[in-house]
Amino acid sequence: MNIEIKKQYDLVDYEASVKFMQLRVNEISNNLQKELIWFLSHDHIYTKGTSANENEILKTNDIKIVKTNRGGKTTYHGPGQRIVYFMIDLNSKKKDIRKFITVIEQSLIDFLKNYKINATTFKDRVGIWVTGKDGQTFDKEEKIGAIGLRLQKWITYLSLIHISEPTRPY
């Protein structure tokens, strides 16, 4: 099957998106739907992955906090940030979660190169980090994206790359 690409420009409710992904994963596993890459943004929300700690949120500013079953720590989502959810059937590919994550990370790094933005990953840190722009190296790296992952029957969902912007309400 070909992979469907879905782009949404309005804000999508986080919990509604999770329900949609769970349904889509079931449909993919039963060969009723294509794999999907979904581009969207959420309203202000914190999502807590399976490795989250209570002290990760400095202040909530009345922003909703939702516990998820994806991997990772606490993540802020909000307007202006692009999120990409991958609903990909790894049964039809190599069942290698690390490789899947590496391919997504490298895709973002390669994309940023087109805009003369240097980015990389670090073995001791989670995420994709911007190290410089237009040939200049930054004094401190800035995180631009991270991946949280969940598998159901070897189909990914809640696997996101979270494209950050500097303005965050925390």
Language-model-derived ranges and their functions:
Residues 161-165, 169-170:
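Single conserved hydrophobic/aromatic residue that forms the stacking wall/gate
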Residues 1-141, 151:
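N-terminal lobe of the biotin/lipoate ligase/transferase fold
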Residues 155-161:
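Conserved phosphate/anionic-ligand binding catalytic regions in large, soluble enzymes, centered on
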Residues 148, 154:
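Active-site cofactor/co-catalyst pockets and adjacent glycine-rich loops in catalytic enzymes
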